Amino acid sequence: MKFDLSAWPEVGLRQVRSAFRAVPLKAYPELAGYSRAEIHEGLAGQGGLFLASDMARLLTLKAGVRVLDLGCGEGTTSIFLARHFGARVFAVDEDLPDSLPLRASRAGVGGLVTPVRADARKLPFPPGSFDAVFSMNAFFYFGTDDLYPPYLLRFLKDRGELVIGSPCYREEIGADAPEEFLLEFPACLAVHSPDWWRRHFAKTGEVEVLHAELHPRGAEFWEDRVRFLLEDRPPEGMKPGMRNMVRAIIRMLNRDEDGFVSHFMLHARKGKPIKLQPNHG
């Protein structure tokens, strides 16, 4: 069902709920006891802790493993990984809030979450520091350069794992892409298809890509986020930037009838580097 933008911003929750799906809480037993606000608040982008849960399921997480949460925003995913798996999480973001240590302490994981305010391209860690890298709704902002995957992989131990979850296009967009799909332009130009991301990491010769697919709830995550934002606060109570973003997402969903705009997950394991022979031809 399409959303009637002619009524924007004077919309009712009945219309919102009839137009967009909500991710069912029962599909995520690890989030039992969480409110929908706790699943979404403090997280940029779509998917909330639903997407974080699915990403974590791909990793081999247990107490004591060292995880780099890269581009963690406010650190909500870092607290989640420490709380549910006992992981020692290094929460890295260049705009990390000062409130993270207190929030981690209140969640009972103050000793497991280490805040690190740093640029993703200038990580202050020695090689082989981590068992896993986790990056949700952030990697496309800094990781599309061909040289970035080899740089990042140096911080993983041998056989260490990496998981990325992010918005994506089902296929690569071209110059004729509908204007509605170019959300957050020009950042959207760094949003790619799962196949693109598979090649991006595989060509390093240093990893085995185990999974690079559209998320089965990829389109649903967009709808669920709109529902939450409008249920949490009516448009007239939003800041102009947020109100405009919600309207832009609705326009995109109205135009996208077959799930071209979605989300993906990539899971890779670091292996022995392939020694490429120089071409002197």
Question: Model regions: which residues?
Answer:
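Conserved class I S-adenosyl-L-methionine
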Residues: M1-L59
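Class I SAM-dependent methyltransferase SAM/SAH-binding core
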Residues: L68, E74-K122
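A short glycine-rich, Lys/Arg-flanked "PGG" loop and its adjoining helix->strand segment in the class I
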Residues: D146-E161
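Short alpha-helix
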Residues: L189-G205
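Conserved Class I S-adenosyl-L-methionine
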Residues: H211-G281
